[in-house]
Curated annotation (Swiss-Prot):
Changing R109E: Loss of viral membrane assembly. One of its GO terms (cellular component) is membrane. The keyword Transmembrane helix applies. It is a single-pass membrane protein. This is Late protein OPG112. The gene is OPG112.
Amino acid sequence: MEMDKRMKSLAMTAFFGELSTLDIMALIMSIFKRHPNNTIFSVDKDGQFMIDFEYDNYKASQYLDLTLTPISGDECKTHASSIAEQLACVDIIKEDISEYIKTTPRLKRFIKKYRNRSDTRISRDTEKLKIALAKGIDYEYIKDAC
């Protein structure tokens, strides 16, 4: 399965800055009924720990345009509490995905927009994003415009 362009467009426009890789994993499970093939412990450019989820041809972080660096076994000790916290969240999500989505307002909003927004509107938002990024316009402004 390839990365879903509609989902990427919504994540980068209307939901920019609101979603995490855990949210993307939950959305993929809910919308596409797919579980990740692999879990990757990573850090972002600021050194913040994040779990990334690998699927067939893409990672959850790609939906958010995040560049994550996998951490080594030795570095896992440094991030042990964050790893435990996020793995607990993963277990909660996997245990009852429907309930998790229902109790998370931004994910409910995302799914509603994903299902109800026309392909034309999403394509238009994606086009706005490309033009704005080419001109160096901030994501926050793009989010407000979409």
